[in-house]
């Protein structure tokens, strides 16, 4: 089964023509570009033979610098040197200001509330900054490959939401790149390892970078490559290891940094010690007038709580995937922080097997993306590889009573399209509001709103007679579109979801955990809401019936009795006793059964008035 054997419009070519395509790892700290050459995925180095391009842009008064040259300006001109822009992309200004208040930049809001960074070259959006980095990578690729690129595959974190993914695509288009696909970083890494070496079975991708941690559980079988579950922690990475060493040095020397420069110096020394401890049993840190020696055992003790935290996240991901650790056949290590021996040792013990480390963990994501780019651009028409990513949080719709009906459950493989039919609640209803939600809870107030739109032009009908088909579609890049259509008239409305800011993987994990912690309460709240909705429906129906036929078909005592039972249900509906509401509904149903029978007989008599048997048999 081949994956998306496509040709872009205008790109049809002879079968033997080789198109130039690359995979790009657009990282928070560093970025890389790779391509398949002579059947092998390789990193494309810059003019100085450097593989890593710092994800930094400096906007000077007279010139713009990208990469290492820009990074060297960070301490000299911090306000005009943009670092870690990946953390800002797809977020609102208030979100950026609350999360990253320590950043040296001056921000203003764009017309749509997104952050603009004030630089010597004017306001720059995170999309523009990312575009400049991508332009640099594009230049490196075209110089190395000797021609114009036909397409690129860009990797993104597994938890990037619609806004962050769309912003990444916008940045690529601004850089003049044809985006073949966005690919989850763990998926790319597993592709570089698993598919390239013929692996089959369950694969775990343990991705520990400088600032974040991601875990993905994947299944590879007969060419189908499926992400079963993902998890992560935005506050866990190699930078945290550096800070732990720095704090240890302060504790040993009793000296605290007095300036920002001293703090940067100490963190740099801590980072160097961490790197030394990768291959040596101890490292010496000389700071101020002191020299202290830290052993690998001491370092392991410092980072133990963080490594344990990552393994707890792994355990949750395995549970989501309904997989036991013993079933995992291979563990792929991604990210520079996985070079730490203690990390490899603990991950190996957790999964019961030695992790795969033969590919440079800094490069594995870009190498996997290059393999996928080579397939999508049409150079490997005989490929049987199929990649399936997943929806990290359930997608649903608001129904009566403030309830959430899940349309696409979390961890559903994408691309995916799911449809469900809904109906009107009131007689003569000609419009329906569609509220799109994200999350695992049962009530609207506990989930995240993604957007709203209104379907108008529904033919006036009795309540429940109209059929509205609502379709949720998530494409291969994780972007969501929702369409609502009234089936008899084909009138429809739709929305493409592009939230103004994104969710971090920490927030996604918190939302999932919240759904587990509140499962019982949520179920009770849902049952109560459903009873209230049913009560509203019954009350509405009885009121309409009384207004239409009550005076004609009921005696005064009967009318008052139904009104009394109706009032009792209206009162009990305001409470929180779902059993009492159910009893009230049953009581009203009993009280109105004779009335309903009389209405039915009256309707039949009216329909038959003036007709003989032959009219009925031969209408």
Curated annotation (Swiss-Prot):
PANTHER family: HEAT SHOCK PROTEIN 70KDA (PTHR19375). Keywords: ATP-binding, Chaperone, Nucleotide-binding. It holds the Pfam family HSP70. One of its GO terms (molecular function) is ATP hydrolysis activity. Belongs to the heat shock protein 70 family. GO terms for biological process: iron-sulfur cluster assembly. The keyword Methyltransferase does not apply. This is Chaperone protein HscA homolog. Chaperone involved in the maturation of iron-sulfur cluster-containing proteins. Has a low intrinsic ATPase activity which is markedly stimulated by HscB. It comes from Haemophilus influenzae (strain 86-028NP). The keyword ATP-binding applies. PROSITE patterns: HSP70_1 (PS00297), HSP70_2 (PS00329), HSP70_3 (PS01036). InterPro entries: ATPase_NBD, Heat_shock_70_CS, HscA_NBD, HSP70_C_sf, HSP70_peptide-bd_sf, Hsp_70_fam, ISC_FeS_clus_asmbl_HscA. Transmembrane segments: none annotated.
């Amino acid at each position: 089964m081949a994956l998306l054997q496509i040709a872009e419009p205008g790109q049809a070519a002879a079968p033997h023509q080789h198109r130039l395509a690359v995979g790009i790892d657009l990282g928070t700290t560093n970025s890389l570009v790779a391509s398949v050459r002579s059947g092998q995925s390789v990193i494309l180095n810059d003019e100085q033979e450097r593989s890593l391009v710092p994800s930094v842009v400096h906007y000077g008064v007279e010139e713009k610098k990208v990469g290492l040259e820009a990074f060297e300006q960070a301490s000299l001109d911090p306000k005009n040197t943009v670092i870690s822009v990946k953390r800002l992309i797809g977020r609102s200004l208030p979100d950026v200001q609350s999360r990253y208040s320590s950043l040296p930049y001056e921000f203003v809001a764009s017309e749509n509330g997104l952050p603009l960074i004030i630089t010597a070259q004017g306001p720059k959006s995170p999309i523009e900054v990312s575009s400049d980095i991508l332009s640099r990578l594009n230049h490196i690729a075209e110089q190395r490959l000797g021609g114009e690129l036909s397409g690129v595959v860009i990797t993104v974190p597994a938890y990037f939401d619609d806004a962050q993914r769309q912003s990444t695509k916008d940045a690529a288009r601004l850089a003049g790149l044809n985006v073949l696909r966005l690919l989850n970083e763990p998926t790319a890494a597993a592709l570089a390892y698993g598919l390239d070496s013929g692996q089959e079975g369950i694969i775990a991708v343990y991705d520990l970078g400088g600032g974040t941690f991601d875990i993905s559980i994947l299944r590879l079988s007969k060419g189908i490559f499926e992400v079963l579950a993902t998890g992560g922690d935005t506050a866990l990475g190699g930078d945290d290891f550096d800070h732990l060493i720095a704090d240890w040095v302060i504790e040993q020397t009793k000296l605290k940094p007095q300036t920002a420069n001293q703090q940067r110096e100490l963190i740099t020394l801590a980072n160097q010690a961490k790197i030394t401890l990768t291959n040596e049993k101890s490292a010496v840190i000389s700071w101020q007038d002191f020299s202290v020696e830290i052993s690998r055992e001491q370092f392991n003790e410092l980072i133990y709580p963080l490594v344990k935290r990552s393994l707890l996240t792994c355990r949750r991901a395995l549970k989501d995937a309904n997989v036991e650790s013993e079933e995992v056949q291979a563990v792929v290590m991604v990210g520079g922080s996985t070079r730490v021996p203690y990390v490899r040792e603990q991950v190996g013990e957790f999964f019961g097997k030695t992790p795969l480390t033969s590919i440079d963990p800094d490069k594995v994501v870009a190498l996997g993306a290059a393999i996928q780019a080579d397939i999508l651009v049409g150079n490997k028409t005989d490929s049987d590889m199929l990649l399936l990513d997943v929806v990290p949080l359930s997608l649903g719709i608001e129904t009566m009573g403030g309830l959430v009906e899940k349309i696409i459950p979390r961890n559903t493989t994408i691309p995916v399209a799911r449809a469900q039919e809904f109906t009107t609640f009131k007689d003569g209803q000609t419009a329906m509001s569609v509220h799109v939600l994200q999350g695992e809870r049962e009530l609207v107030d506990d989930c995240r709103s993604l957007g709203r739109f209104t379907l108008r032009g529904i033919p006036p009908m009795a309540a429940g007679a109209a059929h509205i088909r609502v379709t949720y579609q998530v494409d291969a890049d994780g972007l969501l579109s929702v369409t609502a259509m009234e089936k008899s008239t084909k009138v429809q409305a739709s929305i493409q979801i592009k939230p103004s800011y994104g969710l971090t993987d920490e927030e996604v994990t918190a939302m999932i955990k919240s759904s587990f912690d509140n499962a019982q309460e949520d179920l009770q709240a849902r049952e109560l809401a459903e009873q209230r909705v049913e009560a509203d429906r019954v009350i509405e129906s009885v009121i309409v019936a009384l207004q239409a036929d009550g005076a004609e078909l009921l005696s005064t005592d009967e009318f008052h009795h139904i009104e009394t039972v109706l009032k009792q249900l209206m009162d009990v509906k305001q409470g929180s006793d779902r059993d009492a509401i159910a009893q009230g509904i049953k009581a009203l149903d009993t009280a109105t059964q004779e009335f309903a029978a009389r209405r039915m007989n009256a309707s039949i008599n009216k329909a038959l008035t003036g007709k003989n048997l032959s009219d009925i048999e031969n209408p």
